[in-house]
Every structure is written in C-alpha cells, then in structure tokens.
A protein has these predicted regions:
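Single conserved hydrophobic/aromatic residue that forms the stacking wall/gate
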Residues: 1-12
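Hydrophobic core positions of alpha-helical segments in small-molecule transporters
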Residues: 5, 79, 125-126, 189-192
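Transmembrane helix-boundary elements of multi-pass transport/secretion proteins
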Residues: 13-16, 24, 35-137, 146-149, ...
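Solvent-exposed, acidic/flexible segments
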Residues: 15-19, 23, 172, 222
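Extracytoplasmic/secreted proteins, especially bacterial periplasmic and envelope-associated proteins
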Residues: 21, 25-28, 32
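Membrane-spanning alpha-helical segments of multipass transporters and channels
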Residues: 133, 144-145, 153-282
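Oxyanion-binding "anion nests"
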Residues: 141
Length: 282
C-alpha cells in the first residue's frame, strides 16, 4: 500500500507540473491575443464605455497561501536550511574528532581489546550515542525555538519531528564515521561547509522538483542523509504531513543507518589497523 501511494504521489506531481506548464502557455496565448485585438475593438465603442472597459477587472482574484503564508523567501528556505545546518555541523564535528584521532595516533587505544566486529560495533555505537544526545539538545533549540522566534511555518506535530530525527541523527553519525576514511587531520572537515551547502538544498528536492532531476542526482538524493531528511522535515513541519506521508524518506533514513553502520565499522577497523602498523614501525 505504501509503495502504491508513493507511486501515485509521483504520478500526481508529474501531472501537476504538466498542468502548470500548459496553464502558463494558454494564459500567455490569451494575453497575447488580448493585447493584439482589444485595441481594435475599442475603436468602435463610445469613449465613456471604452474608459470603463479599460479600467474594469473581469476577474477578482484572491490568493491564499496554503503553506508559506507570508510568501517570503526566508520562510520558504530557512526550514530546509535548519536540517542542512544540523547535518553539516554534526559531520564537521565527527570529522574533526576522527581526524585528530588519526593525526595524533590516539585511535590505537581502541585496539587494546581486539578488533572483532563486536568490539568495533561497541565503539561505533558508543560514539554515536554521545553525538545523538548532544544534537538532540541542539535540535530542541534549532527546530523548536528558532521557528517560534522568527515566525517560520510551524504547523507540524512535534512528535513526528522527533520520530524523524531519530534515524536522521543515527544515519548522519554513521555517515560521518564512515567518511572518516578521508580525514587524516582535524582541519580537512572544515572545507565541507562551503562544498555541501547549496548542493544539499538542491538535492533535497525542496528548491527543485526531485522528479525533474537527472537519474544520477536522484540517486545522490538517497545516498546523503540530509537530502531525504530535509524533504521530510519540510513536509512535516511546513505542510502538516503525517509520518506515513513521508514514509519513503523515513524508510530511506533507516536503510542508510544500516548501510553506514556496517561501513563505519569497516572504516574504523581499517583506520585502527593502519595507525597500529604506523606506530609499530617507529
């Protein structure tokens, strides 16, 4: 049922985009015809009637914003940026700590009790628990207080947001520990801030429809935890969706948790072995 509803939602989005394109084209054609022939019609009317027709409004349009009630750029973009900020800063913290461990050689202390999968898994879970606790407190301020202070759209259920944060923080922590493969010092992760910012907003599907992206960008959407989490959070918080309506993104985050947990265990074991060999060769 969930797969059927997701497919139906994708079809609806595509049809809606086609409808918008056809509506814009037909409106443009009608306005062009009106500009061309309306002046010729006014020639045959009395002057007092012509002035009334020119000033008349044939249709009174009253617009009502469904979600972004202020229709501002900030209220549209900032909710998505909040999740990206959490992802970037958590990734940066994990990268700096992991890079410092490798640079100083202190990572070898984890080899004292062996390098079995169970031992490495306990190390990864322990680190992830600390990161998640700290960022849960950070999320209370960022996602709970900031929308109230700045009048951002906030019509979602806080329980649903909390349910979404659990796999998001886990997946981000495991992703960061797996990415420590590339960090050999504490300065390298700082470069990720400028690299990821704009791209993550694009990949999330908030600023540009995911259905219109090339297939490789759609694949990237399901690889980086921030992308599905951002899309799900905007739907939950700004559009009032339920957790079932963001089921695809929610399941994606849990799948990422499993994949990146296993990858983080392998990467950390490799980093420990590499540091141990370097220490023994001295």
């Amino acid at each position: 049922t969930q797969g059927y509803s997701s497919a139906a939602s994708d079809v609806y989005k595509r049809q809606f985009l086609y409808y918008m394109a056809m509506q814009e084209a037909s409106s443009g054609a009608m306005l062009a015809l009106n500009d061309r022939y309306r002046p010729e019609m006014l020639v045959f009317l009395p002057q007092q009637d012509a002035s009334k027709i020119v000033s008349a409004q044939p249709i009174s349009v009253v617009g009502t914003a469904l979600y972004n009630f202020t229709e501002g750029y900030g209220t549209y973009l900032i909710p998505a940026v909040l999740i990206v900020i959490m992802f970037q800063t958590l990734l940066m913290v994990i990268g700096m700590i992991s890079g410092e461990e490798r640079d100083s050689g202190t990572i070898v202390r984890f080899a004292s009790e062996g390098l079995s999968f169970g031992r490495i898994a306990r190390v990864i879970i322990s680190k992830t628990f600390v990161y998640c606790v700290l960022y849960t407190i950070f999320a209370l301020f960022l996602l709970g207080l900031i929308p109230l202070l700045f009048g951002l759209p906030d019509i979602g259920n806080y329980l649903n947001t909390l349910i979404l944060l659990i796999p998001f923080l886990l997946a981000t922590s495991f992703f960061g520990l797996a990415a420590s493969y590339f960090f050999t010092d504490s300065e390298a992760p700082l470069l990720m801030i400028a690299f990821f910012s704009v791209g993550l907003i694009f990949l999330s599907g908030v600023s540009y429809p995911l259905e219109l992206m090339p297939w490789y960008w759609q694949m990237a959407h399901y690889i980086i935890p921030a992308a599905p989490a951002t899309l799900a959070y905007v739907q939950l918080n700004s559009m009032g969706a339920s957790i079932e309506q963001v089921g695809v993104e929610y399941v994606t985050l849990w799948v990422q948790c499993v994949v990146y947990f296993l990858l983080a265990c392998w990467v950390y074991r490799r980093n420990i072995l590499k540091a141990s060999r370097a220490l023994s060769s001295l």
